[in-house]
């Protein structure tokens, strides 16, 4: 093939499309039909080239209600940044970490926010954690994306405004875990410019930013992550005193 790999991702349709070309969002049936076509091409490429070449993103499987493929399907996870194989990697990493033997796990109750698309899978991980360690309670909140509207359902586009609106008065603990994928590169602001500190103040709780990898997520649930030290601001003066 002329390219190393191709990621197939469903278009995200927001509520702000007035005057733009009409796009029809995928539903469970159309996502399943599209997956069937892509998986046929994947099988052909794997037979001819020894790898899939075409990689459907995780959204297709979640929309279609299908289990994501095993790790072998994703080869080297070349399209991870486009959301291809992210859930499989998260799931396997989380499960491996959860199986690691532990003793004296302290009781802990937390709330976790995520997008509506991944919520069933995150709940699965939360329930698995509670089953192994009954003293750990994890309440998962699926945040409906009112800020962007439309069919936007991924965790990475959830805003602080929507979290406040949907979680205020509904938390089961004083700790809210926010996946770092919801924050900008600086890891301190949501897409609506609300800071993690402002979120905590609005909800009256502590905010814990948790890693997007499965092992880190598992450790966060168990209270094993140490807070990262804050970077010191450097002050420079040029000329004069």
Where are these regions (language model features)?
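Auxiliary Fe-S-binding modules of radical SAM enzymes
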Residues: 5-7, 12-241
């Amino acid at each position: 093939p002329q390219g190393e790999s191709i990621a197939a991702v469903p278009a995200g349709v927001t509520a702000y499309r007035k005057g733009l070309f009409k796009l029809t969002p995928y539903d469970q049936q159309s996502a399943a039909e599209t997956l069937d076509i892509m998986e046929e091409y994947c099988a052909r490429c794997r037979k001819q080239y020894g790898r899939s070449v075409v990689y459907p993103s995780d959204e297709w499987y979640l929309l279609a209600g299908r289990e994501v493929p095993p790790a072998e399907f994703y080869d080297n996870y070349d399209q991870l940044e486009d959301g291809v194989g992210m859930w499989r990697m998260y799931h396997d990493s989380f499960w491996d970490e959860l199986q690691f033997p532990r003793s004296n796990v302290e009781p802990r109750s937390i709330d976790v926010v995520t997008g509506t698309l991944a919520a069933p899978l995150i709940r699965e991980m939360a329930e698995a954690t509670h089953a192994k360690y009954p003293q750990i309670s994890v309440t998962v909140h699926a945040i409906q994306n009112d800020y962007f509207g439309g069919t936007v359902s991924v965790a990475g586009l959830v805003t602080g405004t929507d979290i406040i609106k949907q979680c205020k008065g509904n938390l089961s603990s004083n700790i809210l875990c926010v996946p770092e994928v919801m924050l900008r590169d600086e890891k301190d602001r949501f897409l609506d410019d609300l800071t993690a500190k402002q979120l905590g103040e609005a909800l009256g709780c502590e905010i814990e930013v948790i890693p997007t990898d499965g092992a880190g997520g598992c450790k966060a649930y168990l209270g094993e992550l140490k807070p990262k030290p804050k970077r010191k601001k450097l002050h420079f003066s040029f000329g004069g005193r």
